[in-house]
Amino acid sequence: FAPDGDTADFLAWCKNLMPQDRAQSVKVVRADVGMTDTPYTSISHLTTASLADLSGKIGADMAQTRFRGNIWIDGAEPWDEFNWIGKEIRVGTAEFEVVEPITRCLATHANPQTGERDADVLNTLTQHWGHKDFGIYLRATKSGHASVQDKIEFL
């Protein structure tokens, strides 16, 4: 089914996810804009090098899914993405403004597989780097297509 068009089928599908003793969804409410953590439509951009550095400080491999990134890149130096703020980049044929760092919340402490809080991400970031930021927000300035293995170009 197509969740955007088949509302009844979507609600029926959701019913199986909800506890029987809780109120059930009865309608779909659409927002006028995307639901993001920013007041603008944003894309989260993270690097595997920064993740490896953070994982080393925590003493355990942190899953990429813990940080819910839209775009992950290889090949950058750890934490170099913060130097891109204020610049414009191209990924594939899409172009973006690098807007700001992503300040993290307690959700990053939860293991995405188990739901248990098993890593003190915020204190680790603060102790080693003096901030609670991991990743950067992008704002699209030109629509286009991005694919796995596309290079990042600075404009």
What are these model-derived regions, one by one?
Residues 1-155:
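Metal-cofactor-dependent catalytic cores
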